[in-house]
C-alpha cells in the first residue's frame, strides 16, 4: 500500500477537531464536577483517609447514651422538686404560678440552648458543642444543689428559676450535636439498624432515667428518714455527677466521617445562602417542627404534672407512697419505647408515630371520661396513665427525634434538628403553662381530653412527614452539594 502524505495530513486535520472536542468535553466535565462540589466521601479510599478509631466511635455512642440518660434525669427532677417544695413551703409559699415558672425555666433554657448549639455544632464542631453543654449542665445543677441555702423564700425560688435555666441551656444544647453525632456514627456502624440504635440511646435512655431517678429519690427519703432538705441535696448532687462523667468521655471523642467531609465550616454564608436552605427544606422543617410541638405540648406537662396528680389522689398524702406510685408510673413507658424502636424498621417511622398518636387519642378520652371513677382506684389509674405514656413514647416519642435528624443533610443536620426541637420545647412550655390553670378551673380530667384532641392533630401531621428510613444520608449530602453549587454556593471543603 502506497503512503500518501497529503491524505495522511488530511486525515490528521479531520481528526483534530474531534480530538479537540473530546478534550474540551473532558475539561468541562472536570470543571462541572469541581463546581458542583462533589465530595467522594462515599468512596471507600476517600473515607478511609479520615475515619475515627473504633474506640472513638464507641465513646461517641456511649457518651450519647449517658448524656441522654442525664438529660432525662434532669427533666425528671421536676417531679420530686415540686413535692419537696410543696411540703417545705406550703401552698402559700409555693403557689401554682411559681411551680409553673420553675418547670418552664428548664424549658426556656433548653429552647435557647438547642437553637444556639444547633447552629454552632454545624458551623464549628460536634465535639466542642458537646463539651460545652456538659459543662453547663454540671454548673447549673451544682448551683441548684445550693438553692435551700438562699433566703428568704421568695429569693430562693427566683434563684432556683435562674440556675435551672442555666442547666436547661446545657440540656437543650445537648440535643442537636448529640443527635447529629449519634445518627452519623450509627450510620457508619450499621446503616440498617441506625433507627433502632438511635432510639435506644435517645428516647430509651431519657425514658429509663425517670423511674431510676424516682428510685434514687425514694432511697434518699428512706436513708434520711424523710428529711426533705437532705433528700433535695442528695438527688441534685447525684444529678451533678453524670455530666462530669460525660465531659471526661467527650475529651477522647472526635467528629464523625460524614461531618468531616460535609460541613459548612469554610462556607461563605450570606443571607441568600440561608434562604436557599430554607427554600429546599422548608416542608420537612415545617412538618417536623409542628409534629414536635404537638407531641411535647401534651407529653411534657403530663409527665411533670404526674406527681401532683398522684399526690392529690393518695389519701394520706404520704410522700413515700407518692414516690412508689411515681416509680411504677415512670417504669411503664419503657417497654413502649422498646416496641417503638423495633417498629421503626418493621413498619417505618411514619406509621409508628401515627400508631402511637392513635393510642394516645383513645386512652386520653378514656381516662378523661372515667376520671371520677379512676381517682378512687389508684392501681387502675396508674396502669391506664402509664399505658397512655407508653403509647406516646412508642409512637412520636421514639420517632420524631429520629425523623428530624435523618431528614436533613449532614452539613445542616444540627440546625434542622435544633429548629424542630425548639418548637417541641416551646410546645412543652406552652403546655405546662396551660395545664396547671386548666386543671384548677376545669378539673384534672380536662387535661386528658385536651391530650386526646391534640393527638388527632398529631396523626394528621405525621402523615405528611418523610419516611426517613428510606433516605440515604450520603446521597442527601451530595444532593445538597449539587443544589448549592447550581445556585452559586459551591461547598468549600476542609
UniProtKB/Swiss-Prot annotation:
Recorded hits in Pfam families, A to Z, give: Sugar_tr (PF00083)
Q: List every stretch annotated Disordered.
A: 1-51
GO cellular component terms, alphabetically, are:
plasma membrane
Identify the species of origin.
Aspergillus flavus (strain ATCC 200026 / FGSC A1120 / IAM 13836 / NRRL 3357 / JCM 12722 / SRRC 167)
Q: How does it sit in the membrane?
A: Multi-pass membrane protein
What GO molecular-function term can you cite, just one?
A: carboxylic acid transmembrane transporter activity
Residues glycosylated per entry? 40, 58, 68
Give the protein's recorded name. MFS-type transporter lnaF
What are the Basic and acidic residues biased-composition ranges? 12-26
Q: Where is this protein primarily located?
A: membrane
What the protein does? Answer: MFS-type transporter; part of the lna gene cluster that mediates the biosynthesis of diastereomeric piperazines. Lna and lnb clusters encode sets of enzymes that produce overlapping sets of previously undescribed metabolites such as piperazinomycin-like metabolites or morpholine. The lna and lnb biosynthetic pathways appear to be part of a signaling network that controls the formation of sclerotia, a resilient overwintering structure. May be involved in the secretion of the metabolites produced by the lna and lnb clusters.
- Spell out the Gene3D superfamilies in the cross-references: MFS general substrate transporter like domains (1.20.1250.20)
The text of the family note is: Belongs to the major facilitator superfamily. Sugar transporter (TC 2.A.1.1) family.
Q: Where in the cell is it found?
A: Cell membrane
Keywords attached to this Swiss-Prot or TrEMBL record, sorted alphabetically, are: Cell membrane, Glycoprotein, Membrane, Transmembrane, Transmembrane helix, Transport
Q: Which residues cross the membrane?
A: 105-125, 128-148, 156-176, 203-223, 228-248, 290-310, 323-343, 354-374, 383-403, 446-466
Amino acid at each position: 500500500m502506497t503512503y500518501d502524505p497529503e491524505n495522511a495530513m488530511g486525515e490528521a486535520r479531520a481528526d483534530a477537531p474531534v480530538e479537540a472536542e473530546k478534550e474540551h468535553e473532558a475539561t468541562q466535565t472536570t470543571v462541572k464536577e469541581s463546581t458542583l462540589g462533589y465530595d467522594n466521601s462515599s468512596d471507600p479510599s476517600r473515607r478511609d483517609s479520615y475515619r475515627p478509631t473504633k474506640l472513638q466511635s464507641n465513646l461517641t455512642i456511649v457518651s450519647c447514651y449517658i448524656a441522654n440518660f442525664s438529660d432525662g434525669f434532669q427533666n425528671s427532677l421536676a417531679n420530686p422538686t415540686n413535692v419537696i417544695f410543696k411540703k417545705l413551703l406550703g401552698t402559700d409559699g409555693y403557689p401554682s404560678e411559681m411551680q409553673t415558672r420553675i418547670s418552664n425555666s428548664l424549658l426556656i433554657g433548653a429552647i435557647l440552648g438547642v437553637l444556639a448549639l444547633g447552629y454552632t455544632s454545624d458551623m464549628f464542631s460536634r465535639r466542642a458543642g458537646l463539651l460545652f453543654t456538659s459543662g453547663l449542665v454540671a454548673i447549673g445543677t451544682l448551683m441548684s444543689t445550693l438553692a435551700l441555702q438562699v433566703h428568704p423564700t421568695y429569693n430562693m425560688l427566683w434563684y432556683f428559676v435562674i440556675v435551672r435555666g442555666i442547666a436547661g441551656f446545657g440540656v437543650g444544647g445537648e440535643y442537636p450535636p448529640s443527635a447529629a453525632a449519634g445518627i452519623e456514627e450509627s450510620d457508619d456502624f450499621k446503616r440498617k439498624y441506625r433507627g433502632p440504635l438511635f432510639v435506644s440511646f435517645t428516647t430509651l435512655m431519657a425514658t429509663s432515667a425517670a423511674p431510676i431517678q424516682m428510685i434514687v429519690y425514694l432511697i434518699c427519703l428512706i436513708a434520711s428518714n424523710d428529711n426533705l432538705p437532705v433528700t433535695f441535696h442528695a438527688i441534685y448532687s447525684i444529678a451533678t455527677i453524670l455530666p462530669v462523667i460525660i465531659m471526661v468521655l467527650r475529651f477522647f471523642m472526635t467528629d464523625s466521617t460524614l461531618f468531616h467531609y460535609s460541613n459548612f465550616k469554610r462556607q461563605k454564608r450570606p443571607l441568600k445562602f440561608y434562604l436557599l436552605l430554607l427554600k429546599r427544606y422548608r416542608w420537612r422543617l415545617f412538618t417536623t417542627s409542628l409534629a414536635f410541638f404537638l407531641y411535647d405540648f401534651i407529653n411534657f406537662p403530663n409527665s411533670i404534672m404526674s406527681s401532683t396528680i398522684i399526690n392529690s389522689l393518695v389519701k394520706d398524702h404520704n410522700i413515700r407512697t407518692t414516690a412508689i406510685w411515681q416509680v411504677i408510673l415512670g417504669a411503664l413507658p419503657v417497654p413502649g419505647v422498646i416496641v417503638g424502636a423495633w417498629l421503626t424498621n418493621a413498619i417505618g417511622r411514619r406509621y409508628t408515630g401515627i400508631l402511637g398518636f392513635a393510642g394516645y387519642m383513645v386512652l386520653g378520652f378514656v381516662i378523661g371520661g372515667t376520671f371520677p371513677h379512676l381517682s378512687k382506684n389508684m392501681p387502675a389509674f396508674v396502669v391506664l396513665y402509664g399505658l397512655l405514656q407508653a403509647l406516646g413514647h412508642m409512637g412520636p416519642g421514639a420517632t420524631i427525634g429520629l425523623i428530624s435528624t435523618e431528614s436533613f443533610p449532614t452539613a445542616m443536620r444540627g440546625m434542622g434538628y435544633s429548629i424542630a426541637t425548639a418548637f417541641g420545647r416551646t410546645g412543652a412550655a406552652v403546655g405546662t403553662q396551660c395545664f396547671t390553670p386548666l386543671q384548677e378551673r376545669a378539673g384534672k380530667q380536662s387535661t386528658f381530653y385536651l391530650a386526646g384532641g391534640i393527638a388527632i392533630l398529631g396523626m394528621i401531621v405525621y402523615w405528611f412527614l418523610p419516611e426517613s428510613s428510606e433516605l440515604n444520608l450520603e446521597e442527601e449530602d451530595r444532593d445538597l452539594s449539587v443544589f448549592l453549587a447550581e445556585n452559586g454556593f459551591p461547598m468549600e471543603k476542609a
